[in-house]
Structures are given as C-alpha cells and as structure tokens.
C-alpha cells in the first residue's frame, strides 16, 4: 500500500520519463512537485518505491525510471480521468470530414491520422461479418501442380487464390475433398468453418476422406480467411523506428516489421472483446516480439457488419491518458461514420 506522497512521486516519475525519456532524479522531482520536502526525503520515498519494484535504476544514470509493474500500478490506481481537449476534438472531427468512396479508404485514413496524432503505430481491424456463409467451392487445375481455389460466399463475393501443390499430391485426388466441402460446409457461416479448422473437428472429419489433408486444409483455410476480409489497416508502421528503447538491434526491427505485415499475427494480439478500452504492457500482450511495447485496444461494433478493433502500439513510456482518450474518441467517431456506409 503506497502512501499519498509515494503515489505522487510515482506519478511524477512516470510523467517526466514519458516527456523526456531520461531517468528522473530527486532534485528534478523536488522542483516538479508542489510539496515542501527535502531532497533526502524524496530519495527515501524513491527507495521505498524501488523496494516495491515500481521503479528501477538504470546502469547509465543515477536517476530512476518506472518499471513495468510501476506502469501497471499507475494505470490501475493513479491515472487521472481527463477530458479530451478542444484541440484534440477538432483534430478527430477534421479527420472524418473527407468523402470516402469505400470503407477501406475510411479505415486507411483513420489509421494514418490516429498514428500522426499519437506518434504510435495505429491499427484498425475491419469488422468481420458473422452472417456470411459458404455457398460453393471448386478447384481449377493449371499447369505444373498449380491450381486456382475459388470460394463463393452468400454475399455474392468470389474469392480466388493460386496455389502450388506438393508433387506427391495429385490434383485429381482432391476431388473428394471438394465434394465433401460442398456437401458438408455449404450454408455454414465462414467464421464457424474457420473455427472448426482451428480445432480438431474439421481436420478429423477430412482425414476420413483423404489420408493426409494437411495441404488441402491450408489451401482451403487461406481462401476462407480472405473471403471474410481479414483486413488490417495500419498507420505509422515506421513509427516503431522512433521507439529507441524498444528495439535492441536490426534483427529485432526486421522481425517486428515482418510481424506488422501479417494480418493474422496482428489480429491475434489486437483482438479484444466488447467496446471497453484495454491496456496491455509488455508480456501481457503474449507476443515475444512486443515485450518492450504497450498495446491499447478498443473494440467497436457496426450493426449487421460485425466487430472491429482500434489499437495503438507504442513504447511502454507512451502518454497513456491522452492516447486512451484519443482512441476512445476515434472509436466513437469511426463507429458513426461506418454506420453511414451500411
């Protein structure tokens, strides 16, 4: 249990470190805080915070910086409720005033402007419709073990993708699989079929039709995912270059940029339930590549379209209060704008 003075000092350390990215010392805190205490008293309080693992010492400085536990304590107990400033409100309003021919254009622009306002990498997961069903599936043989997989869904959309099969697998041997899909999966929601593939249910059923269904399952799964528009819109992808303390070397940066190119990987970490805002720090994200980052997510729902997500990926020392307010404001504005398109 922290004392009021310790809470004040922890909040001040987090604020100054967020602004400067430099370790915070007792003298700086004494100048910043509106309390009459000696530098020695502040050092004692900082020692108590360090013992509680809420702040830590850097090897390169005598000052202290917040630990991940310190940020979590701040988010859960200390972060004050603020209102969106008039300037921020105007920025949000301006970003939605344009004319957008397609929803994808709206989402691209929203991600771009949100990243500019926050300095973070903005991610928007397009809502996935839950009512789209499988209407038909076929394979069109080409040359050299290549084929085109064609999926038709109940919204009239035709999704196709070219694949190359392993040499040991004859295209003609997949006829029974195609028949099985059309007999058993037609009329089922696409998302339900995807869930069946992720469990053992569909692979087990297909193994009764063909001994090694792995290659076909991957082919079919890829087309299914594309058909429901597993779309991720990203703004400020290269903002990660500004998070100096979050990237250790070029290899880390390369892996991170590759991760940000993967719609599937991004959806896995950014997916959230409900419209409330969630902040995950470091290991809470459950993705090793993002252990030095924080992720703010907010869900939104578009009637008859499905659930989407807005997210901000940034350094652990990001300005949480402002970013949470902005992501909430964007969530409300984006929801209203998308409803106009339905």
UniProtKB/Swiss-Prot annotation:
One of its GO terms (biological process) is negative regulation of DNA-templated transcription. InterPro entries: GAF-like_dom_sf, HrcA, HrcA_C, WH-like_DNA-bd_sf, WH_DNA-bd_sf, WHTH_HrcA_DNA-bd, WHTH_transcript_rep_HrcA_IDD. Keywords: Repressor, Stress response, Transcription, Transcription regulation. One of its GO terms (molecular function) is DNA binding. Belongs to the HrcA family. Negative regulator of class I heat shock genes (grpE-dnaK-dnaJ and groELS operons). Prevents heat-shock induction of these operons. This is Heat-inducible transcription repressor HrcA. It comes from Leuconostoc citreum (strain KM20). The lineage of its organism: Bacteria, Bacillati, Bacillota, Bacilli, Lactobacillales. The gene is hrcA.
């Amino acid at each position: 249990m922290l004392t009021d003075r310790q809470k004040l000092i922890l909040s001040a350390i987090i604020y100054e470190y967020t602004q400067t990215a430099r370790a915070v010392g007792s003298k700086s805190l004494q100048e910043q805080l509106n309390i009459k205490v000696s530098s020695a008293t502040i050092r004692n309080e900082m020692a108590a915070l360090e013992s509680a693992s809420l702040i830590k010492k850097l090897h390169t400085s005598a000052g202290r910086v917040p630990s991940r536990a310190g940020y979590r304590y701040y988010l859960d107990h200390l972060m004050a409720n603020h209102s969106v400033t008039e300037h921020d409100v105007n920025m949000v309003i301006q970003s939605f005033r344009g004319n957008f021919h397609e929803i994808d254009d709206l989402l691209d622009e929203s991600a771009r402007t949100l990243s500019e306002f926050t300095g973070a990498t903005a991610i928007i997961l397009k809502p996935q419709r839950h009512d789209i069903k499988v209407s038909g599936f076929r394979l069109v043989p080409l040359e050299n073990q290549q084929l085109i997989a064609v999926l038709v869904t109940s919204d009239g959309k035709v999704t196709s993708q070219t694949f190359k099969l392993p040499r040991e697998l004859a295209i003609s041997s997949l006829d029974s699989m195609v028949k099985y899909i059309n007999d058993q999966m037609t009329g089922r929601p696409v998302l339900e079929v995807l869930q069946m593939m992720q469990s053992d249910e569909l692979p087990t059923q297909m193994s009764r039709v063909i001994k090694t269904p792995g290659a076909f399952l991957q082919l079919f799964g890829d087309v299914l995912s594309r058909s429901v528009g597993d779309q991720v819109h990203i703004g400020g992808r290269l903002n990660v270059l500004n998070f100096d303390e979050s990237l250790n070397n070029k290899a880390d940066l390369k892996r991170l940029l590759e991760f940000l190119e993967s719609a599937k990987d991004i959806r896995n970490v950014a997916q959230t339930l409900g419209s409330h805002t969630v902040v995950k720090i470091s290991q809470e994200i459950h993705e090793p590549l993002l252990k030095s980052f924080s992720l703010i997510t907010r869900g939104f729902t578009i009637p008859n379209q499905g659930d989407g997500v807005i997210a901000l990926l940034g350094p652990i020392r990001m300005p949480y209060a402002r970013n949470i307010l902005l992501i909430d404001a964007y969530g409300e504005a984006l929801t209203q704008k998308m409803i106009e398109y339905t």
